[in-house]
């Protein structure tokens, strides 16, 4: 469906992306992860052609988007904030988007507006953060695109609204085979929704793989010791997930027998091997406490 080939982009002399390649298939939800400033938003803006790559190619169903702008009618981008929407009401936004997206489904949009009880007469800027997110998603899905680019869609909203937003995404993919490329600092959302993920680090896209396969690469070990082994563990560059008294929880690659042997040599009184979640893998890859 969408294919990025060796995409590179520098902004103000700083290399943001370098030789990034990725293919997202029809009906796939792909999670894009990375620290703040790693280039996630830049990548979405490049696909939507809001900004242009210095080199590389973006294809939709084999057609180069830059040379065939009408292809963008199949793609919609939902940024973290959308100041363009601010001065318009729902109906005004529908009128605008119908001109851009010929497949825009007004009936479906109205149905979702009623379901989520979003005020139709208020201007976008007058809505709460949660309602803004829901309205943006309603408009994005009603445009009937093949690919939706979502930048932090659940940022700043309460738990109930977040649940509704996530369910709307899942339903859309299940019912219409829509593809979604999503960035989010809420790793539990990514873990719940995505088929595959990739990490943006050092200007490149790494570890593009099935989410379950990625989690299978690591093992979480909970141990208890008679003595303080904190320094010894950290000197081996073993990610420490938690320490509570004599209990230590670490994360290591399953294939790293050397680190596992080192931990065994510390003679733990307790040794429990546990499944991992995506946030723990993220910490293991990027180190330290999460700062994104």
Swiss-Prot record:
The UniProt record lists the keyword Nucleotide-binding: yes
Signals that turn on the gene: Negatively regulated by YtrA.
InterPro entries with a match to the protein in the record: AAA+_ATPase, ABC_transporter-like_ATP-bd, P-loop_NTPase
Gene3D superfamilies membership: P-loop containing nucleotide triphosphate hydrolases (3.40.50.300)
Cellular compartments annotated: Cell membrane
Recorded superkingdom: Bacteria
Residues where ATP binds: 34-41
GO cellular component, one term: plasma membrane
PROSITE patterns in alphabetical order: ABC_TRANSPORTER_2 (PS50893)
Function summary: Part of the ABC transporter complex YtrBCDEF that plays a role in acetoin utilization during stationary phase and sporulation.
Subunit structure: The complex is composed of 2 ATP-binding proteins (YtrB and YtrE), 2 transmembrane proteins (YtrC and YtrD) and a solute-binding protein (YtrF).
Family: Belongs to the ABC transporter superfamily.
Listed name of the protein: ABC transporter ATP-binding protein YtrB
Protein source organism: Bacillus subtilis (strain 168)
């Amino acid at each position: 469906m969408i294919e990025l080939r060796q995409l590179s982009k520098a902004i103000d002399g700083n290399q943001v992306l370098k030789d990034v390649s990725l293919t997202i298939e029809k009906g796939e939800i792909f999670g894009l992860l990375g620290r703040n400033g790693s280039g996630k938003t830049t990548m979405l803006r490049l696909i939507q052609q809001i900004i242009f790559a210095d080199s590389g190619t973006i294809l939709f169903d084999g057609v180069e988007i830059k040379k065939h702008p009408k292809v963008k009618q199949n793609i919609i981008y939902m940024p973290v904030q959308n100041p363009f929407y601010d001065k318009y009401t729902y109906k005004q936004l529908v009128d605008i988007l119908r001109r851009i997206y010929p497949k825009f489904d007004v009936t479906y949009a109205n149905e979702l507006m009623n379901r989520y009880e979003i005020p139709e007469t208020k201007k976008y800027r007058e809505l709460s953060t949660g309602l803004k997110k829901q309205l943006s998603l309603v408009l994005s899905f009603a445009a009937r695109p093949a690919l939706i680019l979502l930048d932090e869609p659940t940022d700043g909203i309460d738990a109930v609204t977040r649940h509704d937003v996530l369910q709307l995404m899942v339903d859309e993919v299940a019912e219409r085979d829509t593809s979604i490329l999503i960035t989010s600092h809420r790793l539990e959302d990514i873990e719940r929704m995505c088929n595959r993920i990739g990490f943006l680090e050092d200007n490149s896209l790494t570890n593009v793989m099935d989410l379950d396969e990625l989690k299978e690469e690591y093992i979480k070990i909970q141990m208890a010791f008679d003595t303080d082994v904190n320094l010894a563990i950290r000197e081996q560059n073993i990610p420490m997930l938690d320490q509570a008294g004599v209990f230590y929880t670490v994360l290591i690659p399953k294939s790293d027998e050397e680190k596992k042997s080192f931990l065994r040599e510390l003679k733990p009184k307790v040794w429990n091997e546990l499944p991992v979640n995506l946030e723990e893998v993220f910490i293991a890859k990027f180190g330290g406490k999460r700062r994104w």
